[in-house]
Amino acid sequence: MKTLFILSLLLNTELFHNSKKGIKFYKKGDYKTAINLFIEEMKNKKKFKNYFYLGQSYSMVNDNQNAIKMYEKALSGKFSKSIIYFEMGLSYFLLEKSEEALQNLNLALKYDPNNVNYLINRGSIKYDLGLINSACMDWMNAKSIDINSIDLELININCN
């Protein structure tokens, strides 16, 4: 029994180490190594935080299909829903699926309605979809929250 406990402790320590290493490589910009470490860890133990970081890593190597799959899995955990929806929206946008991107940005703003970055990006997606007035409203809302958040020239050129 003691041997089983020690073996279990060693295995869990290695998994924790892979997770920490995965985040370390993610932060250093070595996304391919981070992906491999997160996948290795998740073979044995599913952690929703790792799904998020795995999604981020996939997104950074332009594998947005897999990024979306990982973000969807991350939603089941306790990780911040707003950031997951935001990142998933960006991945959809990069796949040229603007309507799905907009749906996700709407959800991100439901959880964090005054997030300037979300408003600016949702405005850009709306603009891409031809929803000019609505895009301009998002940009103006962002500006009202933080005057320095958006280039006023962008608003003047696109909204007047």
Residue positions per predicted region:
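Register position in tetratricopeptide repeats
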Residues: 27-28, 60, 94-95, 128-129
